[in-house]
Amino acid sequence: MAQAKKKSTAKKKTTSKKRTNSRKKKNDNPIRYVIAILVVVLMVLGVFQLGIIGRLIDSFFNYLFGYSRYLTYILVLLATGFITYSKRIPKTRRTAGSIVLQIALLFVSQLVFHFNSGIKAEREPVLSYVYQSYQHSHFPNFGGGVLGFYLLELSVPLISLFGVCIITILLLCSSVILLTNHQHRDVAKVALENIKAWFGSFNEKMSERNQEKQLKREEKARLKEEQKARQNEQPQIKDVSDFTEVPQERDIPIYGHTENESKSQSQPSRKKRVFDAENSSNNIVNHHQADQQEQLIEQTHNSVESENTIEEAGEVTNVSYVVPPLTLLNQPAKQKATSKAEVQRKGQVLENTLKDFGVNAKVTQIKIGPAVTQYEIQPAQGVKVSKIVNLHNDIALALAAKDVRIEAPIPGRSAVGIEVPNEKISLVSLKEVLDEKFPSNNKLEVGLGRDISGDPITVPLNEMPHLLVAGSTGSGKSVCINGIITSILLNAKPHEVKLMLIDPKMVELNVYNGIPHLLIPVVTNPHKAAQALEKIVAEMERRYDLFQHSSTRNIKGYNELIRKQNQELDEKQPELPYIVVIVDELADLMMVAGKEVENAIQRITQMARAAGIHLIVATQRPSVDVITGIIKNNIPSRIAFAVSSQTDSRTIIGTGGAEKLLGKGDMLYVGNGDSSQTRIQGAFLSDQEVQDVVNYVVEQQQANYVKEMEPDAPVDKSEMKSEDALYDEAYLFVVEQQKASTSLLQRQFRIGYNRASRLMDDLERNQVIGPQKGSKPRQVLIDLNNDEV
């Protein structure tokens, strides 16, 4: 029985397979493909009108559909392909869109034919008419064909010709929506929102225009009233309101630094300075925390009793110490002022030159500075600023100037500044710069010079908080450093501000040896300089320890807490002094101990502001291997003196401009957070004035150096020792070859890698070779002609 069942099931399976195969054979009837190929061939013949059959097919479609027959060809081909492969009629949104598009094109073709042919289009295209048309022309124009004719004839009486046009546009839009497979509701919603937004913006623009027109009317009325008042007061003044023509006799307001000098001598200046600011945030100690902070400050001082700090090693506050008076500085000699008539003449020449080149502008103001004269140009509406900047050389030629610097635009002003060098640079002395401000409450206030307007410029170091000074040799960099140091000596006592001076050139800052403000003697050895900077880093970390234990955030809050503690407990705990570190030539330090110096500068510039430690770095080689990206990013304030190329200027201040400076103290200053440069003529300070101030300070108090801050003495070459017996031979080999590497020692002495590495470490520790700098070869620091070799 089981075998019989198996045989019956096997028979059923075979019969079902035969049925499916027979169905497939029926479905895969080749007649369908033959018909599809035939339709495609006929459509191609009709489209290209190939032979008698092609012309007959095209004539038939032309009679039915007119100019819209080309879309009909495409739709027939697409439908044939779809039906052949899918074996069903397409029923999609795109199919409906194609049909709607065909109807819309019938309307469009017939409307175009109606407007172009007139009465001819109104004739019914019966077969006799069609036959006559083909006798006169191979391809007569039937517009939308028979279908288009009857569609238009039926629609015009119902909805008029204008209504047919609207219906046609709607059909075209609907076909596009269907073909792109979108919903009419969504498209309508987006369209309405866009229309609303457009109307809203249009209303806003119209209201703004009305307000502007109203303001212009009020402004014109006000100007007319002012003009009438001026004419009543001064009837002899000519009207120069015409912007295109510049009268030669027009007086331009002139401001000069010579007038400022006379004003400053007669009365104190009430003008607020550009860079003066009050730093009053995060420094006030709350009264209800006084008891807790007293205990914290006692614990802090007890915890650091075993260490010799700057306060303990330094001097006791000298009550009798008096800051040097400004009378020690020389009074500036009277100099020949720049002729105002000559400046007026150049202003008229500048206007005429711009006018000759098609630039409509006028000189609204002239500022005579110590080194340059700035002509403030106000261009007319529609004049591009770049057009004025591109006339740089032509302006210099017309004014017979050595060079011209264009500031376009002047920050905060709707004007362009053209800076022309004076025939003679006026000397700016440090005394006239400090006369109005000193003595200052800010002990780190330093004088820089005078700006283009002739106003004295002083800046607080604690707001910089670090400064980069760079420029070529002889541009005034060392004078600027001397002016900064002298400003500190004239304003701060030794217990208020401490100095650390690093001078690898050995001649610039040696005059300050012995002043009580110094932490250590002036450092001239580059190796000691790197160690001195590391000592400053250690002092910074110690101060942050104090701030942490006393719950204060910076040096100002800590000193306020100490003063309050001294008043309440009648004690004399020393306050933390500000420390200013000045490096006069960074390039020499980077060449000898670049890695250590860069790391120390990075730590100081990143963290030392709150600790009251400020760094001033000067160099005469503003290249990227000296002013590295790390140093540049961490020093926000920069002073650029005259340099030789725009590349050097970009290295210092990030933009060009320093290459057009005149030298002799002419500088560009970029403050912390400022996006624009300020041109300043640096204050001059003679060597005798520096010596007089130093003598006055030293006579009152001698220097009391902090031994803990002094760098370690360099290793004596005669005492260099190494446990390796090959050290002497390796030493001589490296000095002779003037190159050193671990692989070189391995090959020369046939030793392993570990021993060669230890020899390299010994040579570096004994200052025979420099530190490793990535893939670059190590520098040999000892010459073959050295006596020690």
Curated annotation (Swiss-Prot):
Renumbered residue ranges of the record's region Disordered: 1-25, 209-275
GO BP, sorted A to Z: cell division; chromosome segregation
Signal peptide stretch: none
Gene Ontology molecular function: any one: DNA binding
Cytoplasmic side: 179-789
Single GO cellular component term: plasma membrane
Summary of subunit composition and partner proteins: Homohexamer. Forms a ring that surrounds DNA.
Protein family per UniProt: Belongs to the FtsK/SpoIIIE/SftA family.
Description of its domains: Consists of an N-terminal domain, which is sufficient for the localization to the septal ring and is required for cell division, followed by a linker domain, and a C-terminal domain, which forms the translocation motor involved in chromosome segregation. The C-terminal domain can be further subdivided into alpha, beta and gamma subdomains. The alpha and beta subdomains form the DNA pump, and the gamma subdomain is a regulatory subdomain.
Function: Essential cell division protein that coordinates cell division and chromosome segregation. The N-terminus is involved in assembly of the cell-division machinery. The C-terminus functions as a DNA motor that moves dsDNA in an ATP-dependent manner towards the dif recombination site, which is located within the replication terminus region. Required for activation of the Xer recombinase, allowing activation of chromosome unlinking by recombination.
Protein name, per record: DNA translocase FtsK
